[in-house]
Design a protein with these regions (language model features):
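Extracellular adhesion/carbohydrate-binding repeat motifs centered on closely spaced tryptophans
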Residues: 2-195
Length: 195
């Protein structure tokens, strides 16, 4: 009887150890499965981002790059996205990264705010202040060539969008552009050294 009881006790301990090991293995495999479902996944042509097995919705920042996933469906946004405020954002069509700074899309240049990603219009100065470009309020594209406002003031922008300042030759003629505002002068101009 003592031997049977001892065998039962050993069997119970063995069974307990096996169940503990199985439980640990199950828990480890669950953690592994969750880790495996962290990242971008494409399902039926739609891209999602999962964190620990759950869909992420709204803004996502990875490696200092911003993405936006639809707040209802979790689908990664790509291409142009219009804002109710007017300006638009653009998310790379391949990987969904939000554009910032000056970017070329469909053969045209746009400027996207560094923080918000919204398209900017009007005069935009480079970070070092040396270059000024103009982006059209009607479609946010970069201006090239002559630009005239309602007051009759004129500016000129090179093919790379840089606003002319100082004395410049355009075609056969020389023009003088205010070094601060870029506005083309008319009539005689005293530049300090010569007229």
């Amino acid at each position: 009887m003592g031997k049977v009881c001892k065998k039962s006790w050993i069997a119970a301990i063995f069974l307990g150890v096996m169940l503990f090991a199985a439980g640990f293995a199950f828990q480890a495999s669950t953690v592994d499965a969750q880790a495996a479902t962290t990242g971008f996944r494409t399902v039926k042509g739609k891209t999602y981002y999962y964190k620990n097995g759950k869909k992420v919705k709204g803004w996502l920042t990875l490696n200092r790059k911003k993405y936006f996933l639809n707040t209802r469906t979790g689908v990664l946004l790509k291409g142009w996205q219009r804002s109710s405020r007017g300006p638009k954002r653009y998310f790379n069509k391949k990987n969904g990264v939000m554009y910032t700074g000056m970017k070329k899309i469909g053969g045209k240049y746009y400027y996207f705010d560094i923080k918000t990603g919204y398209t900017k219009s009007g005069f935009v100065r480079s970070a070092n202040g040396a270059v000024v470009r103009y982006f059209q309020p009607s479609n946010y594209t970069m201006a090239k060539g002559w630009l005239k406002n309602a007051k009759g003031q004129k500016w000129y922008f090179a093919s790379d969008g840089k606003m002319y300042m100082g004395l410049k030759k355009i075609g056969k003629y020389y023009y003088y552009f205010n070094p601060s505002t870029g506005i083309a002068a008319s009539g005689y101009v005293n530049t300090g050294n010569e007229t």
